[in-house]
Amino acid sequence: VINIAGMQHLGMSCIPEKPVSMVIYGAKNDTTVPPEDILAADGYFYEPMKNTVHDWKSKLNCKKSSKSDISDPAEITIEHFYDCIDDKTVTSILDHNNDHDWPKPYKWGINLLFDPLLN
């Protein structure tokens, strides 16, 4: 699962019964589907990204994690949870400077979404 459409509505996050890897991307300045604040500009409430990641890594019983910060050409924090059930992984990618912007092939960093699932 690659979640780039935004956060889930508050209380509506779901985790599949069968183990599957998940990558979630959020942009810190996104007010349409905010990854940290639960209240969006239009009044909808969204689940914080950290809650979704916590629920997935708990359900998949992930035992190890790593965290990396990228500062050039963009400021991004990647948290990767592994040693999970059936070798599945959970990866959180937080862009510290972007807003509500659909990833495009010509933008730097699109590979970050796929690397955790392909490697």
Could you tell me what each predicted segment is?
Residues 12-17, 34-38, 104-107:
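Short, solvent-exposed loop/turn and secondary-structure capping segments
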Residues 4-12, 80:
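Substrate-access "cap/lid" subdomains that shape
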Residues 1-7, 20-23:
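A conserved short beta-strand
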Residues 52-55:
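Alpha-helical scaffold elements adjacent to nucleotide-binding pockets in ATP/GTP-utilizing enzyme cores
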Residues 22-25, 47, 57-119:
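C-terminal catalytic histidine-bearing segment of alpha/beta-hydrolase fold enzymes
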Residues 13-31:
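Short N-terminal signal/transit or membrane-insertion segments
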Residues 35-47:
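Short, flexible/disordered intra-domain loops and linkers
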Residues 28-31, 35-38, 97-99:
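Acidic beta-to-alpha connecting loop that harbors the catalytic carboxylate
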